[in-house]
């Protein structure tokens, strides 16, 4: 077990953190992130650090201990730095463009796919790279996964939408009979 919950989360300058009603509320300017922890872990703020401790000694309490520490760390990191995912489009005639509050994808279907950009997410397109940015790690990952799901990469030619750092295991095509 990694015991990640033992490590306190540092509160950077410019970020205000409050604990109320089973929630950790972090604010920076007009951005707000909330992490709901209920009564599963004990949370306190000690000398500009958020400290977590498990409620009991059972396995589930220890699991929640690390989970809520990681969620809180992601919320604070999102407010200070933000998160980014990049997708790459491969294929003849495959392209993407941002039009207003929608992402228009042409992925070899008879019609373009219009994906509405959610609140708090910025999408930019440069050649065949789609960049997704936001301050909520879960939302950024979800949007990237949804866009990828429209045309996942196929194993023969590698056509489709893939993450920039993703490796596609290629298959050999059929060979002619001798």
From Swiss-Prot:
Physiological role: This protein binds to the 23S rRNA, and is important in its secondary structure. It is located near the subunit interface in the base of the L7/L12 stalk, and near the tRNA binding site of the peptidyltransferase center.
Family: Belongs to the universal ribosomal protein uL6 family.
InterPro entries: Ribosomal_uL6-like, Ribosomal_uL6-like_a/b-dom_sf, Ribosomal_uL6_a/b-dom, Ribosomal_uL6_bac-type, Ribosomal_uL6_CS
PROSITE patterns registered for this protein in UniProt: RIBOSOMAL_L6_1
Pfam families (UniProt xref): Ribosomal_L6
HAMAP family according to UniProt: Ribosomal_uL6_B
Alphabetic keyword roster: Ribonucleoprotein, Ribosomal protein, RNA-binding, rRNA-binding
Gene Ontology CC annotations of this record: cytosolic large ribosomal subunit
The keyword Repeat is annotated on this UniProt entry: no
Complex formation: Part of the 50S ribosomal subunit.
Single annotated GO MF: rRNA binding
PANTHER family per record: 60S/50S RIBOSOMAL PROTEIN L6/L9, LARGE RIBOSOMAL SUBUNIT PROTEIN UL6M
GO biological process, one term: cytoplasmic translation
Protein name: Large ribosomal subunit protein uL6
């Amino acid at each position: 077990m990694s015991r990640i919950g033992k490590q306190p989360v540092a509160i950077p300058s410019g970020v205000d953190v409050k604990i109320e009603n089973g929630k950790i509320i972090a604010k920076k300017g007009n951005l707000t992130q909330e992490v709901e922890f209920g009564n599963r872990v004990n949370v306190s703020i000690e000398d500009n650090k958020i400290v977590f401790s498990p409620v009991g000694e059972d396995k589930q309490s220890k699991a929640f201990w690390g989970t809520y520490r990681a969620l809180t760390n992601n919320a604070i990191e999102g407010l200070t730095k933000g998160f980014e995912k990049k997708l790459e489009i491969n294929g003849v005639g495959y392209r993407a463009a941002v039009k207003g509050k929608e992402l228009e994808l042409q992925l070899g279907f008879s019609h373009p796919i219009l994906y509405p950009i959610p609140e708090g997410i910025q999408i930019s397109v440069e050649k065949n790279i789609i960049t997704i940015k936001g301050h909520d790690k879960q939302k950024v990952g979800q949007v990237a996964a949804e866009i990828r799901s429209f045309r996942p990469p196929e194993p023969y030619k590698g056509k489709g939408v893939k993450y920039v750092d993703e490796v596609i295991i290629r298959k050999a095509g059929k060979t002619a009979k001798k």
